[in-house]
Amino acid sequence: TTAADAPTGTWTARAILGGTSFAKTLKIETVMPNRLKIDLDLGDGTIVGNVPLAGKLGAQWLSGATAAGLKADIEVRVTPSTTRFSRFTDYVFDDPARQFSGDPQKLFEGALDANGEARINGVLNLPSDAPGMLNASFATRVFEPGGAFSINRNTRAVAPFERFVGLRLPKGDSARDMLMTD
């Protein structure tokens, strides 16, 4: 632990063991707790393809007062996940030949209304070369008048396609770890 009055910033820890030197960068930060309760409602279930998202963002101060007029934004990062369906446990639905890394994208940027709410309407820009199911991580920030912000993170499953094709490989020879063919 660090002392409450310890200086913040980026520090470097160095250790010399034998003739080898090791260095590790450490970030010491002051952590501010959230002062706003944030609720992002995009409905239930899996987000499908490039279907427009419609939802509601709501925020209120932890004291119970509405967060009227505060600025807010939602950033989404999409990452690959393993595709599984409970009825088809023996099948592989992910394409190992496809690589995917998603860039962050803004879903919303604006101000909350007098009730501390905002309507969310947007589309996730999904790549056509996704290897299978994806996870969308929503980072919602609501900014206080002084510039500090509270943050909330949600993760939802995303199906980039309406239909999936799976392969079921034969069991093969487990002793030699290979498929037997005629």
Label for each model-derived stretch:
Residues 1-182:
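A structural signal for beta-strand and strand-to-loop patches characteristic of beta-rich domains
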